[in-house]
Each structure stands twice: as structure tokens, then as C-alpha cells.
Amino acid sequence: GGCNGPTRGWRGPIWQFYPRKRANIHTASRPGAVDAGTYDHCDSPKLNKHEWGWDAEMEKEMRARGPKRKIEPFAANCGYRYLLHVDGNVASSRLASEMHLGATIFKQDSFSSEHFYPLLRPWRHYVPVDRSLADLDEKYRWANANAREAEEIGRRAQAFAREHLHTGSVACYWWQLLSALADLQPFAPRTGADLGFRPA
């Protein structure tokens, strides 16, 4: 059985890849402190235990239902002093946009990353939170007790975003990445009008 036998499937638990459900648990246990919810399209009744790769911990966390929400515009984030940034199935692309807001970001330890993550520093650009969110309450209490330091973290994140995450700098990153990859090609690329485009 398993991945190598006649029945193919995922071997091992996958609950660790659904951290947004853990934020819902914090909402239920600390109303007013954490405001997390689930959009209707995130929960599919079609996904059964077999498809999730069942284990007891996953079952508990997937049953933790936060309040159902309607999708709000990104500008709604401007009303919060703190933002909790957790991954989805991979790194969430929202972080760059959230950093522009100047709010203090509580960023979950991530198993995946975007191109700018190596430049970020915990306690300088964000408040680090364990992947399990087990220390979220502790970090929230720290931020409330050290409001000035927490606000400064948000300001530094905003300054970082303005310098490194604007349209021009992101385009520069992609230009350099694709140029470096082009140098590694062991062949000359085909060009011409018959391909439907012309190189600049």
C-alpha cells in the first residue's frame, strides 16, 4: 500500500499544513483578542477523512470552525493594530501587501518562503510566532505590554516594504532571476515572428 504499492496516496499526517484552522481555535478561546474566521470557499464537504490523510490531531483541528466570513476587501486590514500572518498550503502572498500597512505583523514560522523572506528579521520586521501558534497568546501579551516596541516593528516592516517590495523592485528581482536562468540554458532560444512574440 501507500505511495509505492497498488494503492496510491499520501502517507502521513497533513494537518500541519492547515494553520489557519488553528487561528480559529484562538478566536474561540480568546474572543476579542484574536479575530480569525473562515471564508465559505475554504471548507469543502467533498474532502473526506481519506482525502485529508486522517490522523486524530488533524480531525480535531479541522473540526475547529471559526466564524464564517464574507470575503472583505484588503483595505479592511487597515483597521487592525496587529495582523496575524499564517500560511495556507504554501507561503501566503499577502505578507508583502500587509507589510505596507504599518501594522505589527505576527508571522508564523513558515515551512515555505517568498523571494524576500531571507531579508526579514524576527523582532525587527515581525513578531515571530511558532508554527503551531502555541505561543500566540504570549506574543500578544508581549505586544500589549510593549506597545512602543511593537509599533516600531510595524514601522520597520513598512519601511522595508517601501524599499524592497514596490513594483519596480519586484520587477528587478524577476528580471535578475530570469536572466540568471537564461544563462544556464544549454541551448539558444528560438526567436522570430512565427513564435507569436518578438524579444525587446
Could you say what each language-model-derived stretch is?
Residues 1-70:
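Phosphate-/polyanion-interacting regions in eukaryotic proteins
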Residues 71-199:
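Catalytic binding pocket for nucleotide-activated donors in carbohydrate/polymer assembly enzymes
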